[in-house]
């Protein structure tokens, strides 16, 4: 018994070819399938068909006197290239096969199909060409010389699925008879084939891309580069790309968007919108001729650049948008005053005494006086009063806050001075001086340039705090040899030699 698993790829392929099986390239994924197929052939008792003895080579007949080859009975009719095209291309491959070998191939296929329905036939274009090509033939394919293209005219080969053959079909075997088969394809099917449609398989590239959801090489559909519908105008900014998106090396060299959106033309603004933009500082004007005059804005400043067409000099004027807003508010108040005066004149109960100009003039003066009183009582006086209250409240708040901050700073300076005085008294005690004069400490800490009223007032507060609250220091009065009294401090705390 031959050990199939120890065979090399070439030996496995040769054994399968000898037993009439169609073998493609033996790889890591197909070897297990071919091993199963060879084991089944060996276990089924399939014998190696006897190779026909090669007789003397007969003289090659001319194309005119060559007899027509007999077609085998077992394979069904199939598509073939016309005789004229085949003769012109010189692509006919003549191969001699034993009829019993062909029938054994169909028997082995039937047994395999009955035993295991899950095993599928693996075919590749290279294996189909190499398994049935004659060693001495040097013919070329029919389509040699045509350029390889991926245009929509390219067609892919359909998928063939073998159909089962009934068991009771009579088969005739003749081992001695030989049949010469004129093949125009790269493979001879052993059983009738039928075309089975596979969902999702693309067998033809057509100009219609209704069923395609993505781009195909060589068959790019026409694209609409401009969206003109009203609904798509809101998506104009979606096709824009930034430099950050193009920094990724993974998509380098690839376009980020195939859609070019149409730039929306600026719409015409009305009077109200122009006035509002002018108040906000966005109402820029530019001349029809480029470079004659235009506006710029930098923060709260507006810059007007204007070119003199005669001299060619450029004039730059700078204004502030807040000034324009103030003038605009004054204009609004004036317009409101005029409207109120007209409304008062039309609705007042005071009628002109005379129907001449003096009578109507009196009504207009009364309307102006009443309008001013209205503005003063309901606009100016409340605003001024509110402003005064706001200023007073803000002054009180910020004044109190400033007072607290100054008080905290003064307390911090006072405590810092107390620490310095205490440290000086302790150091004097360590050096061997039991008493320290208060004026001496003052002169050391405050030179004559710093003896101002604020510093002297802080010194008095520090002396008072030490005499009252400091337990490590005692205050005494010594009488000097001159008879004068002097206030001194004495350190009565810990006599440690450490210097802090």
Swiss-Prot record:
Q: What ranges does the Perinuclear space topological domain annotation cover?
A: 347-378
Arranged from A to Z, the UniProt key words for this protein are: Cell cycle, Chromosome, Membrane, Nucleus, Transmembrane, Transmembrane helix
GO-annotated molecular function: chromatin DNA binding; lamin binding
The cross-references to SMART domains, in alphabetical order and at most eight, read:
LEM
Tell me which GO cellular component terms the UniProt record holds.
Answer: chromosome; nuclear envelope; nuclear inner membrane
Cross-referenced Gene3D superfamilies: 1.10.720.40, MAN1, winged-helix domain
Query: Nucleus as a keyword?
Result: yes
User: Topological domains (Nuclear): residue ranges?
Assistant: 1-325, 400-500
Q: What is its main location?
A: nucleus
**Localization per Swiss-Prot or TrEMBL:** Nucleus inner membrane; Nucleus envelope; Chromosome
Q: How does it sit in the membrane?
A: Multi-pass membrane protein
- Biased composition (Acidic residues) is annotated at 103-122
Q: Pfam families this protein is in?
A: LEM (PF03020)
Q: Where is the LEM domain?
A: 1-45
Biased composition range(s): Low complexity? 46-57, 77-89, 130-141, 168-197
| TM spans (from-to) | 326-346, 379-399
Give the knockout phenotype: Moderate increase in embryonic lethality of progeny of X-ray-irradiated adults. Reduced lifespan to 18.6 days compared to 22 days for wild type animals. Decreased contour ration of interphase nuclei, nuclear envelope invaginations and faster turnover of emr-1 at nuclear envelope. Delay of daughter nuclei separation. Two microtubule-organizing centers (MTOCs) found in close association with nuclei during nuclear separation instead of only one as in wild type animals. RNAi-mediated knockdown leads to embryonic lethality and chromosome segregation defects in the F1 progeny.
Question: Where, by tissue, is this protein expressed?
Answer: Ubiquitous. High expression in germline and intestine.
InterPro entries referenced in this protein's UniProt entry, alphabetically: INM_ESCRT-Associated, LEM/LEM-like_dom_sf, LEM_dom, MAN1_winged_helix_dom
GO annotation, biological process? chromosome organization; chromosome segregation; microtubule organizing center organization; mitotic cytokinesis; negative regulation of BMP signaling pathway; nuclear envelope organization; nuclear membrane reassembly; response to X-ray
The record's section on CDD domains has: LEM_LAP2_LEMD1 (cd12940)
Biased amino acid composition, Pro residues: 58-75
Q: How does it assemble?
A: Interacts with lmn-1. Interacts (via LEM domain and the C-terminal nuclear domain) with baf-1.
| General function of this protein | Nuclear lamina-associated inner nuclear membrane protein that is involved in cell division, nuclear structure organization, maintenance of nuclear envelope integrity and nuclear envelope reformation after mitosis. In interphase cells, plays a role in anchoring and spatial arrangement of chromosome arms at the nuclear periphery, forming so-called lem-2 subdomains. Both arms of autosomes but only the left arm of the X chromosome are anchored in lem-2 subdomains; sequences bound by lem-2 are mainly repetitive chromosome sequences and inactive genes.
- What is the name listed in the Swiss-Prot or TrEMBL entry for this protein? LEM protein 2
Q: What's the source species for this entry? A: Caenorhabditis elegans
Point out the gene that encodes the protein: lem-2
């Amino acid at each position: 018994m031959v050990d199939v698993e120890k065979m090399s790829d070439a030996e496995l392929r040769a054994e399968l070819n000898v037993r009439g099986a169609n073998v493609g390239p033996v790889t890591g994924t197909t070897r297990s399938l071919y091993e199963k197929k060879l084991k089944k052939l060996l276990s089924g008792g399939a014998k190696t068909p006897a190779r026909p003895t090669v007789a003397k080579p007969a003289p090659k007949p001319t194309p005119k006197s060559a007899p027509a080859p007999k077609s085998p009975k077992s394979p069904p009719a199939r598509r073939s290239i016309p005789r004229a095209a085949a003769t012109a291309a010189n692509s006919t491959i003549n191969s001699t096969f034993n009829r019993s070998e062909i029938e054994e191939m169909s028997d082995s296929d039937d047994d395999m199909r009955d035993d295991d329905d899950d095993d599928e036939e693996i075919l590749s274009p290279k294996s189909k060409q190499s398994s049935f090509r004659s060693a001495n033939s040097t013919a070329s394919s029919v389509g040699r010389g045509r350029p390889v293209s991926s245009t929509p005219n390219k067609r892919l080969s359909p998928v063939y699925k073998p159909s089962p053959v009934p068991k009771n079909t009579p088969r005739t075997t003749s081992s001695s008879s030989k049949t010469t088969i004129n093949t125009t394809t790269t493979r001879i099917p052993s059983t009738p084939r039928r075309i089975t449609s596979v969902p999702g398989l693309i067998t033809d590239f057509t100009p219609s891309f209704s069923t395609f959801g993505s781009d195909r090489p060589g068959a790019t559909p026409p694209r609409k580069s401009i969206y003109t519908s009203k609904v798509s105008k809101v998506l104009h900014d979606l096709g824009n790309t930034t430099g950050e998106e193009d920094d990724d090396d993974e998509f380098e060299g690839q376009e980020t968007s195939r859609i070019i959106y149409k730039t929306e033309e600026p719409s015409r603004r009305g009077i109200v919108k122009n006035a509002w933009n002018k108040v906000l500082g966005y109402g820029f004007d530019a001349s029809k001729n480029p470079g004659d005059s235009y506006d710029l804005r930098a923060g709260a400043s507006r810059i007007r650049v204007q070119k003199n067409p005669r001299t060619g000099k450029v004039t730059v004027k700078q204004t502030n948008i807040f000034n324009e807003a103030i003038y605009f508010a004054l204009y609004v108040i004036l317009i409101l005053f005029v409207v109120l005066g007209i409304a008062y004149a039309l609705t007042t109960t005071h009628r002109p005494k005379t129907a001449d100009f003096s009578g109507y003039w009196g009504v207009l003066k009364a309307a102006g006086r009443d309008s001013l009183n209205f503005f003063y009582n309901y606009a100016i006086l409340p605003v001024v009063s509110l402003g005064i209250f706001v200023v007073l409240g803000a002054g009180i708040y910020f004044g109190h806050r400033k007072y607290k901050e100054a008080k905290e700073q003064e307390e911090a300076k006072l405590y810092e001075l107390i620490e310095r005085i205490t440290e000086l008294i302790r150091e004097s005690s360590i050096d061997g001086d039991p008493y320290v004069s208060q004026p001496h400490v003052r002169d050391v800490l405050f030179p004559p340039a710093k003896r101002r009223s604020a510093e002297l007032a802080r010194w008095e507060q520090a002396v008072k705090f030490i005499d009252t609250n400091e337990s490590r220091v005692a205050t005494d009065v010594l009488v000097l040899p001159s008879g004068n009294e002097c206030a001194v401090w004495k350190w009565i705390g810990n006599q440690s030699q450490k210097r802090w």
